[in-house]
Amino acid sequence: MKRIVLLRLGHRPERDKRITTHVGLTARMLGAEGMLLASDDSGIVQSLEDVVRRWGGNFYIKNNVSFKQEIRNWKEGGGKVCHLSMYGVNLPDLADELKKCDKLMIVVGAEKVPPEIYQLADWNVAVGSQPHSEVAAVAITMDRIAEGEPLEKEFPGAELTIVPAERGKHVIENAGE
């Protein structure tokens, strides 16, 4: 089974709470096992842990990590690092290679990314050549490299489950799961 973890760089607690939360939610929904936050924001941790508690799965978040140390540890453990931006090799040209990777760290920045990221990454991947959202970059990339259909992923241990319906909201509360 493919292991994917997201490394979030440049999060500014006063400005990026919502977008960083959405980056984590998107990564979780599309199959990442966790998110490493290279900043200190316990509110993000609390929000994502609450989602996992209510909606299930085993997604984790580590707060205030050293991005250099996390990348080093990941690579020493046999993993590869994919940095998403507007610059680099076009995603469609690398998607097949990324799909073959069993252990992948996806790096996504907020503000200006430290220049060494471009050297530390195994791949610098352009998700389009126009300004875009980090959420979009994560969603497009993870969908392109997914095993199976990521939108059909099940999340064990959920307190709540959405039942597909043509109209309206149908949410069930799972007893003791």
Swiss-Prot record:
Its EC number is 2.1.1.206. InterPro entries: Alpha/beta_knot_MTases, tRNA_m1G_MTases_N, tRNA_mtfrase_aTrm56. It catalyses: cytidine(56) in tRNA + S-adenosyl-L-methionine = 2'-O-methylcytidine(56) in tRNA + S-adenosyl-L-homocysteine + H(+). It comes from the Archaea. SUPFAM superfamilies: alpha/beta knot. The keyword Methyltransferase applies. It is an enzyme of class 2 (transferase). One of its GO terms (biological process) is tRNA nucleoside ribose methylation. Its main location: cytoplasm. It is found in: Cytoplasm. GO terms for molecular function: tRNA (cytidine(56)-2'-O)-methyltransferase activity. S-adenosyl-L-methionine binds at residues 84, 109-113. GO terms for cellular component: cytoplasm. The keyword Methyltransferase applies. Keywords: Cytoplasm, Methyltransferase, S-adenosyl-L-methionine, Transferase, tRNA processing. PANTHER family: TRNA (CYTIDINE(56)-2'-O)-METHYLTRANSFERASE (PTHR42197:SF1). Specifically catalyzes the AdoMet-dependent 2'-O-ribose methylation of cytidine at position 56 in tRNAs. Homodimer. NCBIfam families: PRK03958.1. Belongs to the aTrm56 family. This is tRNA (cytidine(56)-2'-O)-methyltransferase. It comes from Methanosarcina mazei (strain ATCC BAA-159 / DSM 3647 / Goe1 / Go1 / JCM 11833 / OCM 88). The lineage of its organism: Archaea, Methanobacteriati, Methanobacteriota, Stenosarchaea group, Methanomicrobia.
